[in-house]
A protein has these predicted regions:
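Hydrophobic helical membrane-anchoring modules
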Residues: 1-4, 145-148, 170-236
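Short loop->beta transition adjacent to catalytic acidic/histidine clusters or analogous donor-positioning motifs
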Residues: 2-4, 25-35, 43, 55-56
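Hydrophobic/aromatic residues located in beta-strands of well-ordered beta-sheets
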Residues: 6, 33, 58, 86, ...
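Short beta-strand/loop segment that forms part of the nucleotide-sugar
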Residues: 8, 30-40, 59-60, 89
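Short, well-formed alpha-helical segments that are part of the catalytic scaffolds
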Residues: 12-26
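Acidic helix N-cap motif at the loop->helix transition within catalytic regions
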Residues: 15-19, 42-51
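A conserved acidic beta->alpha catalytic loop
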Residues: 37-46, 93
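Acceptor/aglycone-binding surface of glycosyltransferases and processive sugar-polymer synthases
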Residues: 57, 61-80, 85, 97-178, ...
């Protein structure tokens, strides 16, 4: 039986963590959970510690250092313990645990499954128009300049094979924010790995504060542009 690990990066998710953990535990799936907390001042790390058991583990990081580094540390932890599939998932309730099974089914024949908002069957609930516009423009821009045929490059609900995770760690990706997700897909695509897209429903958080900032958006845009230029130069 495949070993499956869900990685939940957290920063100030005290209002959401117990609920998402409870929902995951209610699934009839053989899964384990790793909370990677960036020293949340609201006590998220301590809440995670109180929930530890045979199916839940916690990594405490010294400071808030971004999504990418949190996942990279979680990936290393997962490979060291022999997991076959690693799930990326938000801890704020935006990603529905009930949809995890459909992603895992697709993972049996692929290296990367992208939970996709912007495809038939996918949708976004409770987002203002400007958040939709930023997300649609960002993923469309990245897909265009990087020539990638995927509909949701910044999606944070994914399943990765251990082979892809190993490649990601070897690549030493430096991006901290959502650009990390774009770079990960590019790496999988250029490595000729099998990639699938599965529709998901994305819910805007009802508690806590979004981590999306102008700085994160700019970093993702700049990183995508740099990756595009780098690819063009390497072809010469």
């Amino acid at each position: 039986m495949s070993k499956i690990l869900i990685i939940l990066p957290t920063y100030n998710e005290a209002e959401n963590l117990k609920h998402i953990i409870s929902q995951l535990r209610d699934l009839n799936l053989e899964i384990q959970i790793l909370v990677v907390d960036d020293n949340s001042p609201d006590g998220t790390g301590q809440i995670a510690d109180s929930l530890t058991s045979q199916d839940l583990f916690v990594l405490h990081r010294a400071k808030k250092d971004g999504l990418g580094p949190a996942y990279l540390e979680g990936f290393t932890w997962a490979l060291d313990r022999g997991y076959d599939f690693i799930v990326e998932m938000d801890a704020d309730g935006s990603h529905l645990p009930a949809e995890l099974e459909s992603l895992l089914k697709a993972a049996n024949a692929t290296d990367l499954v992208i939970g996709t908002r912007w495809m038939p069957g996918g949708k976004v609930a409770n987002w203002p128009w400007y958040r939709r516009a930023i997300s649609r423009f960002g993923t469309s821009y990245a897909a265009m300049v990087l020539r990638l045929p995927y509909k949701d490059l910044t999606s944070g609900y994914r399943v990765l094979s251990k082979q892809l995770v190993r490649k990601v760690l070897e690549a030493n990706i430096q991006t901290h924010g959502y650009g990390f997700q774009v770079e990960l897909v590019l790496l999988a695509h250029e490595s000729q790995m099998v990639i699938a897209q599965v529709p998901i429903t994305f819910l805007e958080r009802s508690k806590g504060k979004s981590k999306m900032t102008g700085r994160i958006v700019v970093e993702a845009w700049l990183k995508t542009t740099i990756l595009c230029v780098s690819r063009l130069l390497n072809r010469r």
